[in-house]
């Protein structure tokens, strides 16, 4: 029999909380968050939103609660505004501008000749990786979901943009649960709760400073990525 990708995982997240998930490649981080919108279903145990098992929600109702920002951004041919409205079809201009500002996309959009009416090529081939990620984040912000799920969605951003974007998101998501999967400790150091996965198991749960002392897997990742000053 095949061994499950994930086992013995228990955690909770409250509104207004940021919960981060980190671990080595192939440890099950993405699988864990893909269980929430039911891209997969659990084989044992359950995942509950507001006390209700996700399998008991109508799929559309469930997914309307969630803003899922995948690792690879999917953009289609159409204007920037069309791509952003994929998150909310009836979004007005004010909502587009607000979401773009939170996602740190506003400046590069305004630099385009046609701004929000600028055409995006199929797959977003006329945008950089970082611009595509910010478009994807803007699309989720415009939905104003109850749960944000970022699947390594800051990886193409430089550290400065990443930090500003997360600070803006924090202000915007006080009513929501934010789940972040990351490879980069810099993106999650200020999370309320960090879950460390190793080979499908939880090997640590806590804040950054605690985990540096108590979790060898986390400390190892931190040592490979952070400077002495950042570790202090």
Task: Put a short name on every predicted segment.
Residues 1-232:
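ABC-type nucleotide-binding domain
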């Amino acid at each position: 029999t095949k061994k499950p990708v994930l086992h013995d995982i228990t955690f909770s997240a409250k509104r207004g909380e940021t919960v981060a998930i980190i671990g080595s490649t192939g440890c099950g981080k993405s699988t864990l968050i893909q269980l929430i919108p039911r891209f997969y279903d659990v084989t044992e145990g359950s995942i509950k939103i507001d006390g209700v098992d996700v399998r008991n929600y109508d799929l559309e109702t469930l997914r309307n609660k969630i803003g899922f920002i995948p690792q690879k951004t999917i953009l289609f041919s159409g204007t920037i505004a069309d791509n952003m409205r994929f998150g909310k079809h009836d979004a007005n201009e004010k909502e587009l501008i607000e979401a773009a500002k939170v996602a740190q996309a506003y400046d590069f959009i305004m630099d385009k000749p046609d701004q929000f009416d600028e055409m995006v090529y199929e797959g977003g081939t006329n945008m950089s990786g970082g611009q595509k990620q910010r478009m994807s984040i803007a699309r989720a912000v415009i939905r104003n979901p109850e749960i944000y799920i970022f699947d390594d969605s800051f990886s193409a951003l430089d550290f400065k943009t990443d930090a500003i974007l997360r600070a803006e998101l924090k202000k915007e998501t006080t009513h929501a649960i934010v789940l972040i999967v990351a490879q980069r400790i810099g993106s999650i150091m200020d999370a309320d709760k960090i879950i460390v996965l190793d080979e499908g198991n939880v090997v640590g749960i806590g804040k950054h400073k605690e985990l540096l002392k108590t979790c060898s897997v986390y400390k190892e990742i931190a040592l490979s990525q952070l400077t002495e000053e950042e570790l202090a």
